[in-house]
Amino acid sequence: MSYRRELEKYRDLDEDEILGALTEEELRTLENELDELDPDNALLPAGLRQKDQTTKAPTGPFKREELLDHLEKQAKEFKDREDLVPYTGEKRGKVWVPKQKPMDPVLESVTLEPELEEALANASDAELCDIAAILGMHTLMSNQQYYQALGSSSIVNKEGLNSVIKPTQYKPVPDEEPNSTDVEETLERIKNNDPELEEVNLNNIRNIPIPTLKAYAEALKENSYVKKFSIVGTRSNDPVAFALAEMLKVNKVLKTLNVESNFISGAGILRLVEALPHNTSLVELKIDNQSQPLGNKVEMEIVNMLEKNTTLLKFGYHFTQQGPRLRASNAMMSNNDLVRKRRLADLTGPIIPKCRSGV
């Protein structure tokens, strides 16, 4: 508090008045002390960091005319440097003469039958346009005029060869309607285990809070009817992915999970994939198009987990490397082959999967 009271005495002082009362010697002393405190002048604006260099005594009177005369005299007395190789003026090679273009032969006058000459003489531009289209002279007209004339037996261009063609009017495509799902009501229906609710679609609802999405994951742990859960484009992040991973370890009904186009990193994706061995009901998982790439290390770990899984049939992710992409494709093909064999044999027990150690 005492330090602040000392500063109060200097609050109303006029710095310009104090600096104006200092002598030149005192100003130099102050400048030297400031140089010691801030040698790089980092606290000053860039335009004020250069010291005053105009205080030196002049070496003599400045006369512009005499300076120009001196520079001109010095330029005349200075000898030009001689060329290392003197210019002889010798011309080598041949002078380029452009070739004469061949002259087009004069077209002979074409004589037509009197009926054709009379018809062409009295034809309008619109009729000539249709005739040119029929004869294949499409360079005289636009594409729209040409195809309209070919597709109609009557005159379709009423304005002639030089008419302005309007572009084709396309029907406006309306924007997709926003997602009409009631977030709070759907959450309550999941908590109440509503048997009529089998698909939850929260796609492109960007204002869902993260705690609400985590509440969905918690509610799905005890739900017995929801088979499809999609949160595409909901700005979900790693905490949501962690909650969904814990849900997959408990839920035994969910078949499809879609978390594409979100902000889930590699750690969140790994948690989701690592939860697959504890889940036997999920057959489709989509994780593509996240805000940041997963990386080669994460992709290899994902493939290792997919090769150990025997129930997942569809995996929505585009691998950047060919090796993980091929291994994941083989794993999904093997799982689908197991389903096909079980369906053909009509077995109720588990089928021993083919060994994938050599994949």
UniProtKB/Swiss-Prot annotation:
Which keywords describe this protein according to UniProt?
Actin-binding, Cytoplasm, Cytoskeleton
Tissue spec: Highly expressed in the erythrocyte, heart and skeletal muscle.
- Transmembrane regions: none
Tell me the segments the record calls region Tropomyosin-binding: 39-138
Name of protein: Tropomodulin-1
Q: Which family does it belong to?
A: Belongs to the tropomodulin family.
- List, alphabetically, the InterPro entries matched: LRR_dom_sf, TMOD
Q: Name one GO biological process term.
A: lens fiber cell development
Q: How does it assemble?
A: Binds to the N-terminus of tropomyosin and to actin. Interacts with FLII.
The species this protein belongs to is: Mus musculus (Mouse)
GO cellular component, as recorded: actin filament; COP9 signalosome; cortical cytoskeleton; cytoskeleton; membrane; myofibril; sarcomere; striated muscle thin filament
Biological role: Blocks the elongation and depolymerization of the actin filaments at the pointed end. The Tmod/TM complex contributes to the formation of the short actin protofilament, which in turn defines the geometry of the membrane skeleton.
Q: Does the keyword 4Fe-4S apply?
A: no
Give any Pfam family that matches: Tropomodulin
Q: Where in the cell is it found?
A: Cytoplasm, Cytoskeleton
Q: Provide the organism lineage as a comma list.
A: Eukaryota, Metazoa, Chordata, Craniata, Vertebrata
Molecular function via GO:
actin binding; tropomyosin binding
Residue ranges of the region described as Disordered: 36-61
Predominant location: cytoplasm
